[in-house]
Regions:
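Hydrophobic transmembrane helix bundles of membrane-integrated enzymes that assemble
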Residues: 1-132, 150-156, 174-259
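Extracytoplasmic catalytic/substrate-binding loops of multi-pass membrane glycan-assembly enzymes
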Residues: 135-148, 159-167, 176-185
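Serine/threonine-rich, low-complexity intrinsically disordered regions
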Residues: 170-172
Length: 260
């Protein structure tokens, strides 16, 4: 917990207004909304088809309150989208066995780590500020593409990982400029190296196959949405946020498991 004087963060909105992002007692204003996202995803897995209308309304209300105070857009949009998807699935009884949408969800569940990792990493490695659309996207993502490109250009990738000297917001001064990598995929590849990254990739592929085999569409959606969020947030290996990383260690010996 930090004093408010240490965390007075502002952001310019799309209409030019300056928005104060309340940290709500934490170091960063994005902390509590991201915790809420993973709690919500975990709640979806535990409650699955038992989720009620009251729960949807209550979670939507909490999501809006957090967005109003913190202006954390990614979490706000992801939670709203997931609630819409869950309601749509409930209305039309969709799971992995559904002909068209089921196949799409099956593909995303199995290959989402590979797809989102490639998209996130390549967008940063090949970032070109002279490209108008990439420059605009970088601005919308609060400079994440530029920071990722700088990290790759400075350190490159290694087999076993390396020490990367980051400079977060609390350490910025006249001598140290901000330097962060928010993409969970790129950060793991830079910090932990290619070998561990490949093991994690294989783990999520194996996990996705088991989820589809069990027809657990709710766990599959939770994994997909968490991996989308990891594209712009460094939560892949952070157990303070992401509980789903533990599923990679599941040995599949319990044949009666209803989850995987």
């Amino acid at each position: 917990m930090y004093e408010y004087s240490d965390v007075n963060f502002y952001r310019e909105s799309s209409n030019g207004e300056i928005v104060f992002r309340y940290p709500l007692g934490y170091v960063f204003s994005t902390y509590l909304p991201n915790v809420f996202l993973y709690v919500f995803l975990s709640w979806v897995v535990l409650r699955n088809h038992k989720l009620s209308v009251f729960e949807f309304i209550f979670l939507s209300f909490l999501n809006y309150v957090l967005y109003d105070f913190t202006d954390t857009r990614t979490v706000f949009y992801l939670v709203n989208l997931l609630i819409f998807v869950l309601i749509f699935m409930r209305m039309f009884n969709i799971d992995y066995k559904t002909k068209l949408l089921g196949r799409v969800l099956k593909f995303l569940t199995i290959y989402s780590f590979l797809f989102f990792a490639l998209l996130s990493i390549l967008m940063q490695v090949f970032y070109d500020p002279n490209s108008s659309w990439m420059f605009a996207l970088n601005k919308a993502l609060s400079g994440r593409l530029a920071y990722g490109y700088y990290a790759y250009d400075t350190y490159g990738f290694s087999i076993l990982g390396q020490h990367v000297e980051y400079v977060d917001l609390l350490d910025v001064n006249q001598y140290n400029k901000l330097f962060v990598v928010d993409s969970g995929y790129l950060k793991v590849l830079l910090d932990q190296g290619i070998i561990l990254f490949v093991f994690i990739l294989f783990g999520f592929f194996r996990l996705g196959k088991r989820i589809v085999l069990k027809n657990n569409i709710y766990l599959g959606l939770a994994i997909i949405f968490s991996l989308v969020n990891i594209m712009i947030n460094p939560h892949l290996l952070l157990i303070t946020f992401n509980p789903f990383i533990f599923l990679l260690a599941y040995d599949n010996k319990n044949e009666n498991s209803i989850y995987i």
